[in-house]
């Protein structure tokens, strides 16, 4: 009987951390779990959650690379970042963002830029670097986050192409309030001592959205012949297949676009593992498109009051799962009251 032999080309924590030369094209990204609410903690650093596309920016002997989390080359779509100045032997984890006229990251503006019509609106693009994975051709994945952040800041990268945002210690609750005040997506809380775990979704990193949102798989589209798409039938990746996650309303100004964007993925059968009621105008879908939806945030496996926001440019089925929020104990805030707002301002590339 033949034993299972690991694929030597598949990146793992051991392979990456034992490498002593060269910089990988990318690393399977570490992902946060969902927090039940904002909290203060002496064990965490708090950062702005960016409304962009996860990406890796690196430079080796062959030059600069900008790739998405699946390893796809982003430079043809974002040529403005070809002259980003980072040292050889460095690999950064971060997000590509485009900002609106008020300096706030806008996924919609980024999606328009990366879409088929390449509408170059908004300010940017810019790469927001929040982690340093390689330096001097050597991996830092096992080093604690706090050290990686200090090394990242010491590189002095901040310019018009690359931004290194600030972070806040201890006081996550007032930081979340400041992020909400400025109309940003949310925050991420990261344990100071956490290593970088490729492809890991652990409670060492926790995310919290100002407006609850989720990645879902589009399993069906309800079409109105005059209006276009009216509702999406959403699903989560689950054991055994696609679990029904409820409906998401499609705003009228996106109805025709969603109708056209989903036609090529139509199917003659339901992709869901359990029966879902058929209705007039229903188009079943192959479970390949990932949508971002905003919702009411109520607990449970089905969305409440969900509203379609955008297609996920870098989506994958593994990200479209029902998340159980993590409960975290909080402590009293310790810093100056104005500090959270200042950190938010200093983090914004065009603030």
PLM segments and residue spans:
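Catalytic cores of nucleic-acid ligases and guanylyltransferases
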Residues: 1-351
């Amino acid at each position: 009987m033949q034993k299972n032999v690991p694929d030597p080309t598949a990146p793992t924590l051991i392979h990456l951390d034992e490498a002593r030369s060269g910089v990988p094209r990318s690393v399977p990204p570490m992902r946060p779990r969902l927090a039940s609410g904002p909290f203060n903690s002496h064990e965490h650093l708090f950062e702005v959650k960016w409304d962009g596309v996860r990406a890796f920016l690196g430079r080796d002997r062959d030059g600069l690379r900008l790739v998405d989390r699946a390893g796809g080359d982003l430079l043809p779509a974002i040529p403005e970042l070809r002259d980003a100045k980072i040292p050889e032997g460095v690999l950064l984890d971060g997000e590509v963002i485009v900002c609106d006229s008020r300096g706030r990251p806008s996924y919609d503006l980024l999606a328009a830029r990366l879409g088929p019509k390449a509408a170059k609106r908004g300010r940017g693009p810019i790469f927001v670097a929040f982690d340093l994975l390689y330096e001097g051709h050597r991996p830092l994945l096992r080093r604690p986050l706090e050290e990686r952040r200090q090394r990242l800041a010491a590189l002095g990268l901040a310019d018009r192409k690359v931004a290194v945002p600030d972070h806040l210690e201890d006081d996550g609750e007032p930081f979340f309030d400041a992020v909400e005040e400025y109309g940003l997506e949310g925050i991420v809380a990261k344990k100071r001592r956490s290593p970088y775990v490729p492809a890991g979704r652990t409670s060492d990193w926790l995310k919290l959205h100002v407006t609850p949102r989720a990645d879902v798989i589009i399993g069906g589209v309800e079409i109105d012949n005059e209006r276009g798409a009216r509702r999406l039938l959403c699903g989560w990746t689950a054991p055994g297949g696609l679990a029904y996650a409820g409906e998401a309303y499609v705003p009228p100004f996106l109805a025709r676009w969603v109708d056209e964007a989903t036609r090529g993925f139509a199917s003659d059968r339901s992709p869901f593992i359990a029966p879902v009621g058929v209705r007039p105008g229903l188009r079943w879908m192959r479970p390949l498109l990932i949508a971002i939806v905003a919702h009411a945030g109520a607990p449970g496996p089905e969305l409440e009051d969900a509203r379609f926001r955008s297609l996920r440019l870098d989506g994958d089925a593994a990200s479209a799962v029902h998340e159980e929020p993590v409960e975290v104990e909080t402590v009293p805030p310790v810093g100056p009251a104005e500090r959270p707002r200042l950190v938010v301002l200093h983090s914004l590339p065009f603030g």
